[in-house]
């Protein structure tokens, strides 16, 4: 029998199941992708109400550089972006949208690279040029203004995105993903009524990671000291992998201590930002997240199909 489940945000920590292993995911176009160490799966809701799923095994990643602190962060991020791009392409094609038909692997890869470059410029370099242009001196004052500008850009962008009806639906799928992961991690039944009892925010969320990156960058840039011109730009670009690696370790640490005082403190900023990037899902959206999780779990089994497969599930 599944253990008694209490809301994640309740003062009494709910029981975690120790042997389920880590799981993550992301929201897709009218769908959800889930990932575990040995497999990934995705599901999308079709216009006729059916759910289409896909799943595939993943190569073992429990050895080598993926286990080394600081080095594992950038590798994990690269894996996440690569798989996220693959799942996004599949979702667009599976739904038969005009956008999906127009995508190609090369085109989507180029779009991802361009988006990454734009993010580095807008979130990495541009905020540092603001205090320099204003003539602000002193490492703490300079970096405080830089971080506030960076935070403002991030929150403003998320806020503008949330005004779009389609993005609001994607944010609801984001919430469904988190709630389903919570339910799985706590041994709950994978049904909409049971899953609804869980928080739509999660400590390992990529949104939380972005905010932790900003906070870690503040500390790292203060330690670097006062620089300007080309050196300033170089430190913001070349220092990004270091900042990302440290931020990954912070998120990993907080995720393993989510019910401790230090864990709650570390998770608080990211939890607040997830209030923007997640929305309460309806039962249809939760069903899609459940389908993605079940497809992922099935792909981990030795008897599962070793190659990606697609199946329609009646609504």
Regions found by a protein language model. Give the residues of each.
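Juxtamembrane helix-loop transition segments at the membrane interface in multi-pass membrane proteins
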Residues: 41-43, 50-56, 129-136, 157-191, ...
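Residue-level signature of catalytic and energy-coupling elements of molecular machines
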Residues: 31, 167, 205, 273
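Juxtamembrane "helix exit" motif at the C-terminal ends of alpha-helical transmembrane segments
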Residues: 86-94, 115-138, 213-235, 241-244, ...
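Select subsegments of transmembrane alpha-helices in polytopic membrane proteins
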Residues: 105-122, 202-214
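Hydrophobic alpha-helical segments of integral membrane proteins
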Residues: 70-88, 130, 176-183, 199, ...
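Hydrophobic alpha-helical membrane-embedded segments
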Residues: 68-72, 145-171, 240-256
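Cytosolic/matrix-facing juxtamembrane and C-terminal tails of multi-pass cellular membrane proteins
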Residues: 256, 260-306
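Divalent-cation
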Residues: 1-88, 92, 96
């Amino acid at each position: 029998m599944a253990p008694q489940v209490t809301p994640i945000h309740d003062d009494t920590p709910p029981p975690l199941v120790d042997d389920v292993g880590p799981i993550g995911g992301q929201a897709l176009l009218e769908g959800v992708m889930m990932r575990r160490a040995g497999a990934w799966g995705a599901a999308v809701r079709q216009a006729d109400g059916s759910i289409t799923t896909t799943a595939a095994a993943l190569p073992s990643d429990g050895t080598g550089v993926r286990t080394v602190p600081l080095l594992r962060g950038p590798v994990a991020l690269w894996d996440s972006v690569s798989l996220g791009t693959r799942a996004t392409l599949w979702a667009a094609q599976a739904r038969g949208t005009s956008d999906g038909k127009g995508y190609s692997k090369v085109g989507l890869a180029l779009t991802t690279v361009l988006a990454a470059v734009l993010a580095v410029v807008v979130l990495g370099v541009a905020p540092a040029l603001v205090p320099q242009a204003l003539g602000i001196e002193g490492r703490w004052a300079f970096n405080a203004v830089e971080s506030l500008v960076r935070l403002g850009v991030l929150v403003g962008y998320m806020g503008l995105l949330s005004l779009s009806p389609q993005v609001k639906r994607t944010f609801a799928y984001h919430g469904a993903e988190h709630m389903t992961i919570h339910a799985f991690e706590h041994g709950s039944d994978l049904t909409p009524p049971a899953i609804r009892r869980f928080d739509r925010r999660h400590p390992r969320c990529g949104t939380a990671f972005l905010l932790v990156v900003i906070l870690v960058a503040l500390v790292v840039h203060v330690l670097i000291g006062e620089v300007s011109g080309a050196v300033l730009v170089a430190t913001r670009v070349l220092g990004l992998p270091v900042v990302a690696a440290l931020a990954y370790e912070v998120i990993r640490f907080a995720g393993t201590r989510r019910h401790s005082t230090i864990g709650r403190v570390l998770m608080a900023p990211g939890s607040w930002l997830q209030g923007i990037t997640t929305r309460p899902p309806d039962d249809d959206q939760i069903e899609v997240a459940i389908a993605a999780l079940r497809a992922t779990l099935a792909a981990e089994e030795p008897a599962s199909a070793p190659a990606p497969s697609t199946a329609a599930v009646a609504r």
